[in-house]
């Protein structure tokens, strides 16, 4: 409305308008004077204004001065007093009324308490400090809404961060994606999982069967060991009735004979009995016993060589020392005579090469189970030799024919 049209108003209308304005200003001033509580959160109108501010910030343009003044007039407790006071000053009709001056100072205080926090390119939001009485308290700091990709802060409304647009996706942590990938890769297909379960079941059954077989083997070994013991005792009694049986079996064995020299064969002729005892039901060791009769070489009646497992699980051997008679120590004599390859009886005191001990292997696995076959070799050899030396029947040549005289 122009100034000319305003001048044409009647004095009654002017007075009525001034009275209404003064009443409104007086009521607003009294309400603002007695209200000591901090302003409440903006209403629906404030949300729309903030949304307009955010839209302007997104476009990157400067905010018009008219929108800024309108936003300032939309604050609570203002009720348009600042705009009306400015209009009255422009018209030159504002009188030095104490109520109007009080309202103007209140509007200036509200305007000074309102601060604008800008973002890149435009004003983002209104930041308002809290008031307690006449003292101003610093406002609450808006939370930082920077994303992981380094974008600028998002505009907020009423101190709450605005959600990002639907086109922008939050970056998922790389560690979580890697863990999920490894989890799915290690799970395997259902067929593989089923095969593994079946394989474990079969393996458990095999282990159970092996344990049962071991127990059954120990029971059978104990049972048949007692039966064998009876027959072994009977065999030993029969062998003792045959002089020189074991000495002849040692000499006739194709492998053991390589460890014997001439003196060893003489000593073994006094061997009356040989025993191989198994240590434990699982054959954890052996004890070999040589029973000798009275002889001119040593005083021992029994020579023992024992094999077993030590505390660390390693195979160890033990033997009783041979008590040689003076001048008949075959070990010392074999060292003095370089032609001899060593004495068989040096095996009793040798505990270094247990794993490569061929003598104990031959005795346990070959000679002891069936010594008769090696004793009979000499009988067969003597029989064949006797057949070769025995002369055959002489063939008679026919007598020459005698011619009769005529």
Swiss-Prot record:
GO biological process terms, semicolon-separated: cellular response to gamma radiation; nucleosome assembly; positive regulation of cell population proliferation; positive regulation of phosphatidylinositol 3-kinase/protein kinase B signal transduction; positive regulation of protein ubiquitination
Region called Disordered, residue ranges: 1-67, 132-164, 382-406
Keyword Zinc among record annotations: no
Gene3D superfamilies for this protein: 1.20.5.1500, Nucleosome assembly protein (3.30.1120.90)
Database matches in InterPro entries: NAP-like_sf, NAP_family
GO cellular component: nucleus
Top-level taxon in the UniProt lineage: Eukaryota
Low complexity compositional bias, start-end: 49-62
Compositionally biased region (Basic and acidic residues): 27-38, 382-392
Function: Involved in modulation of cell growth and cellular response to gamma radiation probably via regulation of the Akt signaling pathway. Involved in regulation of p53/TP53. Suppresses p53/TP53 protein levels and promotes its ubiquitination; the function is dependent on USP7 and independent on MDM2. Proposed to displace p53/TP53 from interaction with USP7.
Subunit structure of this chain's protein: Interacts with USP7.
Family note: Belongs to the nucleosome assembly protein (NAP) family.
Name of the protein described by the UniProt record: Testis-specific Y-encoded-like protein 5
Organism: Mus musculus
Upper taxonomic lineage: Eukaryota, Metazoa, Chordata, Craniata, Vertebrata
């Amino acid at each position: 409305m122009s100034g000319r049209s305003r001048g044409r108003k009647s004095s009654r209308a002017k007075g009525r308008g001034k009275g209404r304005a003064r009443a409104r200003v007086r009521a607003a001033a009294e309400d603002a004077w007695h209200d000591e509580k901090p302003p409440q959160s903006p209403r629906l109108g404030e949300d729309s204004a903030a949304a307009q501010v955010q839209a302007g910030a997104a476009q990157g343009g400067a905010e018009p001065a008219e929108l800024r003044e309108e936003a300032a007039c939309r604050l609570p407790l203002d009720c348009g007093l600042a705009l009306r006071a400015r209009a009255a000053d422009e018209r030159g009709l504002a009188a030095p009324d104490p109520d109007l001056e009080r309202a103007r100072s209140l509007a200036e205080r509200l305007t000074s308490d309102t601060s604008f926090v800008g973002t890149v390119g435009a004003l983002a939001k209104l930041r308002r400090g809290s008031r307690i009485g006449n003292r101003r308290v610093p406002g609450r700091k808006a939370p930082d809404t920077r994303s992981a990709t380094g974008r600028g802060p998002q505009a907020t409304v009423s101190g709450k961060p605005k959600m990002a647009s639907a086109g922008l996706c939050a970056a998922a942590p790389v560690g979580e994606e890697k863990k999920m990938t490894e989890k799915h890769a290690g799970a395997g297909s259902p067929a593989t999982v089923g095969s593994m379960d079946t394989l474990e079941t079969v393996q458990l059954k095999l282990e159970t069967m092996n344990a049962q077989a071991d127990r059954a083997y120990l029971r059978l070994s104990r049972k048949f060991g007692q039966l064998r013991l009876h027959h072994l005792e009977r065999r030993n009694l029969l062998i003792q009735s045959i002089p020189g049986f074991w000495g002849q079996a040692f000499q006739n064995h194709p492998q053991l004979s390589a460890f014997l020299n001439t003196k060893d064969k003489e000593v073994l002729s006094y061997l009356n009995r040989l025993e191989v005892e198994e240590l434990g039901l699982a054959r954890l060791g052996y004890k070999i016993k040589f029973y000798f009769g009275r002889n001119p070489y040593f005083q021992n009646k029994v020579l023992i060589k024992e094999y077993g497992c030590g505390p660390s699980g390693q195979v160890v051997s033990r033997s009783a020392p041979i008590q040689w008679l003076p001048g008949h120590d075959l070990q010392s004599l074999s060292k003095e005579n370089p032609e001899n390859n060593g004495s068989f009886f040096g095996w009793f005191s040798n505990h270094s090469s247990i794993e490569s001990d061929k003598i104990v292997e031959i005795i346990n696995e070959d000679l002891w189970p069936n010594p008769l076959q090696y004793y009979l070799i000499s009988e067969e050899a003597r029989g064949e030799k006797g057949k070769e030396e025995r002369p055959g029947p002489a063939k008679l040549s026919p007598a020459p024919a005698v011619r009769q005289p005529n």
